[in-house]
Amino acid sequence: SNYHPNSLAQSLRGRNSMQIGVVVSDISSPFCSSMVRGVGHTLLEAGYVPLIVDSKDNLELEEHLIQTLLCRRVDGLIVNTASYVNPSLIRVACDGVPVVLCDRYVSDFRFPFVGSQHFSVMPKLVSHLKEEGFCKVAFFTQEYHTNSARFNRRNAYLQSVKEIFPEENGEALTYVLDLSDNKNTARCIRNLLDSCAPGEVPAIIAVNSVTCSHISGVLDTMGLE
């Protein structure tokens, strides 16, 4: 085995700093802002001080920040991780540091996890949109292969479309966006509209609040609602 215990992490055992490291993937997103408020309030009520850092959805930066938090002798970590594949975080847990994942999980290791119930919520949303008269429902997402939350939301969407809009191809209605490329997003929206018959109106489900805000801005520039 190539596993070597981390002496710094092991030195944390038996010590209480009453500090918890909180690693978020994008502090500017509404979700992370809400998460920080909720986690911070809960920790303070329990007598812990949250040390909050932002990885900017960058795995290398996340790894650096976690090591910095460990140097501060935190008693544990709450992590909204940047990547589904995260051997560094697994090593930290194996070294004895308590780690809880929030919203996004990691492959190949069973961390304590707090997240959304995508597969119970998505069918209700898609069914509601059909009842409202939308002809089809598209799914607009950022790259999802290394992000478990986006990946699960996409899979929940595909399953829901298969059940509620059996005549539609959920894969074909999934659009992967680069949020820095407004022109490409506009092309995706136009492609979706062109796939509808005259008079029909499609709906768009955004993978998260940041994507939703981006789509809304592009729709405004296109003169659409």
Which residues are covered by each model-predicted region?
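Short beta->alpha connector loops
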Residues: 56-59, 80-85, 209-211
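Active-site-adjacent beta->alpha loops and helix N-cap segments on the catalytic face
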Residues: 84-94
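Structural motif
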Residues: 23, 78, 203-205
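Generic structural signal for helix capping and beta-alpha/helix-loop junctions
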Residues: 15, 60, 86-87, 109, ...
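Amphipathic helical "hinge" segments at domain boundaries
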Residues: 3-68, 72-76, 143, 155-158
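Bacterial carbohydrate/catabolite-sensing allosteric modules
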Residues: 41-49, 64, 70, 94-101, ...
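Acidic, Gly/Pro-rich loop/turn segments at junctions of secondary structure
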Residues: 79-86, 104-110
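Short gly/ser/thr-rich secondary-structure transition/capping motifs
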Residues: 2-6, 60, 81-82, 187, ...
